[in-house]
Structure formats: structure tokens, C-alpha cells
């Protein structure tokens, strides 16, 4: 089965968040379970400049289509590239006027969305749909799997071709975060090459705007999210971001499949970024990682300190606004904090101020880099993920793998992957972390206090550590679920 994987980020070439990790893990896993996979991405400089070779395929089609004009694009073409360390072929949408810009792929130097993001990502969608129509005469996908709003017009264009009685591949759309919807002015409809008659409440119109996310949810053959709980949550008014009605309407086409962890990158037994390797049977290396983390973040080198770690975007969605309000209690109990992240300026300032207020107990790095992320996740005793909502979450999975107990809120993928250290769960041997419900300082603090209690019981702590480290959230399991879904989309499948 030929699968075209459409996305905008790919680790280690370009990463702004977990989407890059998912692409790097899932696409090769799909190949490993028998799919013939090719990726499609914009030719952002961070990716295109690392290509080992490129071969021209075709210019993107222009002019009239059966439903009206094609998207109005600057010169754009498709090349087939090879990237270092990646065995999968990669199509790159070459459009220098759209993509040849430094820095963040979505934001300008002012930190705001590029004003032409609608056409930038319409070009990606158009490339995906026309590959489905045979743009590459040597390779045509059976399934096009699209990820997040940036690729949301791919299923829309595919449906437009299907409405014109042309043979089309099946389409799958995965929601990584429903809150980011790709909303643009209604005036963009003609320039985007979309059927004008579809700009209504039953199409891709959303409160008077074009919604790339709604377009995908309306026109994709199947919809997935990155955890079963998140699939249920977004079908409710509370977390549906205004699209819950459509998602309930499409309930039979919606499912949740958990993300996995790339064992080549996140494995303490082989992680070259750590002071020493370790596993669930030999944890001496974790002790060294903790000492190294304390040194790196300017924390007092106390072996008996309960070190909390956080690697996150600093936003209210991630629940990090609660943390400054519980730091006094955490430090008073002998705890420490090592935080790596960036985002909301006010939150950044709050954490920098906390590091000044609690020298030797709170260490903060504003920014992000992989080396420090590995240091925090390996060296901390507890990893904090107190999110307001969390489609899947990868940080808690990394924590489990590294023997760093996750402390999470019971939402989305966090609820699906972490078992609370209640007395009952400890007794039956299923506990893997700390879970709380109420999105408040009091809710977070209750879980923090329970972490201190368990930390004073080293034998029980070790048992929970080892249980989490023994779990495997691997991409092959996720890929098998996706493959089974793809197979239901074959012509004649029941």
C-alpha cells in the first residue's frame, strides 16, 4: 500500500514541537509494517538545505479545474529528495517566494503569523492532492495521510477531484491539536482554488472565515486524533473548539490512536547525551544524570532533593501558569525545579524571577535544545505535565521510559498513559505516576505533595520507576493500528 505522509515538520531537520517527533517516528514505522511511504513537506530552508540529492518531478498544476480555477500560486514545483539518515523518499514543494524564509516556519520575525500563510499551506495541500492525481507519473498513493491544519486542504482538493468524477486516493487526517485551526479571511476562497459553493456551514466556512481544520474534518475519509481520550474530549462542547458538532456528526469516522516513542532517540540505555547509560535493572546512570542536571541548572547538589523537571512551551494550555504558585511549598519541602521552555513572556519572567528568589533550588533555561531536554528528562525525579488539555503528550512517555515519574493532569493522552499512585494502584502494581483532576494551584499541589510522600518510601518509588520503564509505547504498535485503518479504506473493504 502506497502512503503519502503530508506534514510540515520532521525531526531532526525542523522541529517546533511534537509534530516533528511524530513524523520521524510514525512514517518509518509505517514503512516497517509493510507500507510504501513517501513524505511531502514544504521546502523550508532547514529541510531543503540538508537534502543529499533532489530530482525534479513537475510543476504544480495551474489554470482551470472542473470546479473552477486552481490555487493562485507563485512559481511552485515538486522535487523528490533524499535526506541524511532517512531511508524514505521525501517530496519537497519548491516555492521560494513562499518558503525561503529564515527562522520559524509559521511565524515572522515579529512573532506573528506570516500574512500569506493561507497560500503557503494551500500550496502544500495542492501538492498532496495533485500527487494523488498522478503528478508524479512513477508513483501514485493509495492513501494520503495528512497532519494538522497546515495540510488540511489536501483532503478538500481530493474531494473536489472526486466530485468531478476523477479517481482519487483515500484520505486520512490526524488532529494533533484542535485549538490551532488555520483560519483565514473569506476573500481567500478564490485565490485558494476552493469550490465557492463549499464556503458555507456545511463546508469549510467557520464563523465567516475559511477554516483549514474544518475543511479537513469535513472532507477527509477518516479522522484520527493522537489518543482515545482526546477523541472523546473534542467531541464535547467544552473541548471541541466550536467543531464538536461536526465531530459528533462524523463520530463513525473518528478514532484515537496513541503516539509512540522513538526508541532510537529516547532510550536511556543507548542515549549518548547522558553521562552514563542506564535501564530499569541498573539505575546508577540515573543518579549520575541527576547530579549532572543539578550542576547544569545551578541547583544544590543534594541527592535527597526531589527534583521536578519541566520541558514545555510556557503557555496556559500546558498548565505551567500554575507552577509559580506552588513553588514556595515545593521548595519548603526540600524540592527543586529544573525548567526548560519558552513561550508566554509573562510566564518566562515569572520563572526567571523564581530562579532569583530561590537560588540553588530553582533553575530555569529559557529556550529549547535537545541536549538540555534529555538532561532534564533523565535527571529529574518527576516530570511535570499539568496541561489544561493534551491531545497525546510525548513528554510523559519520555519520563516513563527514563524512570522519571510523570505528574500529569487527567486529560487526553495523559489520562491514557499514566496510572495514578493511589493506594489501590500501588498495591496491585499498576501505578506509574501522579494524576490530578482540578486545573488549579490546589489541584497541582495535591499531586506534588503525594510525590513527596512516595519519595520518602524508596522501595515503593523504585517499584513505580521500574514499572514505568518497562512499558513500551512504540511506533510499530501505532503503525499497525494505522495500517488496519488504511486497509478499511481500500475499494471493496467492509
From Swiss-Prot:
Family: Belongs to the glycosyltransferase 1 family. Bacterial/plant glycogen synthase subfamily.
SUPFAM superfamilies linked: UDP-Glycosyltransferase/glycogen phosphorylase
Keywords: Glycogen biosynthesis, Glycosyltransferase, Transferase
Catalyses which reaction(s): [(1->4)-alpha-D-glucosyl](n) + ADP-alpha-D-glucose = [(1->4)-alpha-D-glucosyl](n+1) + ADP + H(+)
EC code(s) of this entry: 2.4.1.21
Pathway linked to the protein: Glycan biosynthesis; glycogen biosynthesis
Binding site for ADP-alpha-D-glucose: 15
InterPro entries in the record: GS/SS, Starch_synth_cat_dom
Matches recorded under Pfam families: Glyco_trans_1_4 (PF13692), Glyco_transf_5 (PF08323)
NCBIfam families (UniProt xref): glgA, PRK00654.1-2
Top-rank lineage group of the source organism: Bacteria
Function of the molecule: Synthesizes alpha-1,4-glucan chains using ADP-glucose.
GO MF, one annotated term: alpha-1,4-glucan glucosyltransferase (ADP-glucose donor) activity
GO cellular component: cytosol
Protein name: Glycogen synthase
A Gene Ontology biological process term: glycogen biosynthetic process
